[in-house]
């Protein structure tokens, strides 16, 4: 998690200081700051649920990569899971680590604060964790045929 924060902050710094967000017009930077202010002002319960739902989709995409054999099927599954979480407006803590940092680095108003960054990341991270563990990780752990998995592992070894 700490490594993701560091990566998000470094990536945000590189993007903002490259000038790409402020090009010939400030539309991109203004859009980023507007969206960051919305994310920082979202109530904690909504952030938690958006994080929970998001990570169910992200974990399903990851799980399907292990279960599907064909590369094309894997790509399609990843695309649809990620497309769904993005278009539905769900929240992922790792994506927000960089995006919210961009809003802090760009010229912004009082709605964008370091406290808002922590508010969003804390609730979304908690939702991501519970969504991934309770709704994907544990159910698949309990339904996986352990005898078959052990035999497959022995064949590989």
State the predicted function of each range:
Residues 1-157:
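Alpha-helical transmembrane segments and their helix-helix packing motifs
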């Amino acid at each position: 998690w700490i490594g993701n924060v560091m990566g998000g902050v470094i990536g945000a710094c590189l993007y903002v200081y490259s000038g790409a967000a402020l090009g010939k017009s400030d539309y991109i930077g203004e859009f980023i700051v507007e969206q960051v202010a919305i994310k920082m002002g979202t109530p904690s319960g909504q952030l938690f649920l958006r994080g929970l739902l998001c990570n169910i989709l992200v974990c399903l995409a990851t799980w399907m990569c292990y279960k599907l054999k064909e590369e094309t099927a894997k790509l399609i599954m990843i695309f649809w899971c990620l497309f769904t979480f993005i278009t539905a407006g769900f929240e992922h803590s790792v994506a927000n680590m960089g995006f919210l940092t961009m809003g802090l680095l760009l010229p912004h108003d009082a709605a964008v604060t370091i406290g808002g960054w922590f508010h969003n990341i804390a609730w979304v991270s908690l939702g991501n964790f519970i969504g991934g563990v309770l709704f994907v990780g544990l159910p698949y752990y309990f339904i996986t045929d352990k005898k078959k998995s052990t035999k497959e592992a022995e064949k590989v070894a």
